[in-house]
Amino acid sequence: MTQNLSQLEHNDAFIQRHIGSSVEQQQQMLAAVGASSLSTLIQQIVPADIQLPGPPPVGEAATEHQALAELKGIASQNQCYKSYIGMGYSPVLTPPVILRNMLENPGWYTAYTPYQPEVSQGRLEALLNFQQLTQDLTGLDLASASLLDEATAAAESMALAKRASKLKDANRFFVADDVHPQTLDVVLTRAETFGFDVIVDRAEKVLELDGIFGVLLQQVGTTGELHDYSALLAELKKRKIITSVAADIMALVLLTAPGAQGADVVFGSAQRFGVPMGYGGPHAAFFACRDEFKRSMPGRIIGVSRDAAGNTALRMAMQTREQHIRREKANSNICTSQVLLANIASLYAVYHGPQGLQRIAGRIHRMTDILAAGLQHAGLTLRFKHWFDTLTVEVKDKAAVLARALSFGINLRTDIHGAVGITLNETTSREDIQTLFALFVGDNHGLDIDQLDAAVSQHSQSIQDSMLRRDPILTHPVFNRYHSETEMMRYMHRLERKDLALNQAMIPLGSCTMKLNAAAEMIPITWPEFAELHPFCPPEQAAGYQQMIGQLSQWLVQLTGYDAVCMQPNSGAQGEYAGLLAIRRYHESRNQANRHICLIPSSAHGTNPASAQMAGMSVVVVACDKQGNIDLHDLRQKAEHAGDELSCIMVTYPSTHGVYEETIREVCQIVHQFGGQVYLDGANMNAQVGITTPGYIGADVSHLNLHKTFCIPHGGGGPGMGPIGVKAHLAPFVPGHSVVQIDGMTTQQGAVSAAPFGSASILPISWMYIRMMGADGLKQASQVAILNANYIATRLKNAYPVLYTGHDGRVAHECILDIRPLKEATGISEMDIAKRLIDFGFHAPTMSFPVAGTLMVEPTESESKVELDRFIDAMLAIRAEIEKVAQGEWPLEDNPLVNAPHTQAELVGEWTHPYSRELAVFPVAGVLENKYWPTVKRLDDVYGDRNLFCSCVPISDYE
């Protein structure tokens, strides 16, 4: 035995599981790029003046089992009381078939946003089902594929109302006084930057006001009152005021659709359809509007189109509305949505079907009626006479009732003056009702549930007759076909097989960091201790969450060089918004509200200008030089011209051109010299961790894409997390929360998300990653990511020019391949190459960003040299195919590239092409052993946008 115990223990380290290439493979790649070691390579690439003098103090790595045991101990400090708090969050019963086959399945959670529809037809179908579900329940024409949460959706509805309003001089937005407090909180934050006046009052008071462009109502008020707003909606329509209604997705199963009553926009949380509370998230919001507002609608929309063979195919529709194209003119800065959670909700509806949903909603309402009847029989007073699932019970000694509730292991809503709130849910049992009777009336209450049931079933008037739904819902066959577990399992597997995720192949998308989402990182998110807590439960019941979030925050502080971290933003784009708000509020606190100009390099992510616009700033673009670096002369000139109106600069590092700019510290100094702040976009943190930090570079604030650098999976387009790190002077200006005091934060600022810690239940993923990697592992991950990118660039540069490199001819963690010379010479485009890669079993790199006519490749540290070589071989084989087109061997209009991707149906059909079937589908030998088969040919984008159809198609189209 030549190894000692320490060496044997090290061999069990997670680091070697996460990093795809062995030490021997790394040496081979280093030799190929001309570097002797990883540290030497980093010294050559990263500017010396920004390299950290030592590793960040995040501790040593733990093994998978050690980290899981440690986190389990922390989670055990959480106390899972029975939650009747409501306020938009309810306990659920996630069908095990969905839990196991979707939420715990890497074929679903490791996929990327479906920008490449040919490899995304499965999740696109599930999202189309979500849109159909939303349209049916809301009674409106068009639905989005999800938004970040209900409160964000409310803010987006206000923005839509202003964009679409014909009352151009109106600047007031009215909010009914019984919307959820967290919803109002986020609306007020958004209105602050837009300069809107928000009026909060009883709903009927809106008719007494002038200058109103939009109204927000809540169908089932936050304290439970069920409203019939049909008359009010009709009157507001006459006045050309755009109306939005917040709705409960479960209540909509039984209630009249707000769209049928005249609402223009309807939104809410889909959490109750199978998604655990998770201490606040992640949850998908649904959002629907009338067809006339489709161009103003926020978020992604799935549309039905056709492929090159004329067959039905799905795609993201109207993408020209999105922030990466319209930039500061975009409808919204939303980039990440909540695809995984929307798909759970849609499959919950598919599995239960309309009858099952009506049974669940009906049971919840019946239980509420029984509870109400029993409490009233015992002499208690209810504040409202119409309800769905929530009762406001007036009590004389509120403190005593709440103390007794805690002794029963029960959480009630506590913030209602002179009363408590009780919201029932699908987990509520007969025994729970008996316990509630005992809580309010006493152990000897003498109330019989069956007798109460008989009475209320005959005489219930808790739902007004005018509010009872009479139209059928979910009539499409997809909601009426898969109700046995066997059928449901097979349906989900059919959808999964249509998609390409990380469990099949590398996803080399530039600026997306599609790294391993390890099983050990994912396991804790379904633990009840994390999954079943209400975000507004008493803080002492969430001690485990507080410890875990506190540790993760401290690690992120150490890894970013900042002084504080705010966990609230639910996505990178929302983090940008929150960071810019902090800058804006900081300037205002210094009586410098005039500082409104945001400088943004021309290479920036499209979210940057969209977020700046949302934060009430004016965008001024800074030029880049021929090497892709920020033009310092132009920057200084524009900063000086902005003068005391300069608010900040938004810069990405390494740049979106895939290089470490040598002058990044000078960029920061110039902006600071003129009184501005530096926002460093954290999209490319995977090339910084352990090597440098934004704080060390000189930045003031950054968001961190936990779904990139810190291993939260992309989920097919969400969830994501975008916490912000800030220097001390900005810490008082990060988002706060109106319901929950955030420990360690002195901020009194408005919220940007519904929950105080955003999507808290996925934070254990990043906690596990950092704990298992340790300081050395995190640095090594960054180093290997940089090595992998340089290896690809070195091997491909003679076939495809690398557009931007540093002074030493090297790239950072990603490289941009310039396809423009090939396109000019041969007619073959970056699109053709991207689609041909599908035949080789790869997802395409990022197309035409940040430069049109290019492919941006980011191989993460999780990919092995074997997989990198497979990708390189595919790209070289494609280059050889392009050469055959150039030489006239294949015509431009009929070759493997322009016809890609090739399907099984095409393979067995009539073959008239000048190349073989084998070359079409098995272009290199390695494809044969793990062939991915696309189910559709190339999408017809023009047809899809000219023929917008965003509902479920006939089932025969899927067969």
UniProtKB/Swiss-Prot annotation:
Q: Which InterPro entries match?
A: GcvP, GDC-P_C, GDC-P_N, GDC_P, PyrdxlP-dep_Trfase, PyrdxlP-dep_Trfase_major, PyrdxlP-dep_Trfase_small
Residues bearing PTM N6-(pyridoxal phosphate)lysine: 708
- Catalytic activity reported: N(6)-[(R)-lipoyl]-L-lysyl-[glycine-cleavage complex H protein] + glycine + H(+) = N(6)-[(R)-S(8)-aminomethyldihydrolipoyl]-L-lysyl-[glycine-cleavage complex H protein] + CO2
Instruction: List keywords of the entry alphabetically.
Output: Oxidoreductase, Pyridoxal phosphate
Self-association state and partner proteins as the record states? The glycine cleavage system is composed of four proteins: P, T, L and H.
* Listed HAMAP family: GcvP
Protein name listed in UniProt: Glycine dehydrogenase (decarboxylating)
Species whose genome carries this gene: Yersinia pestis
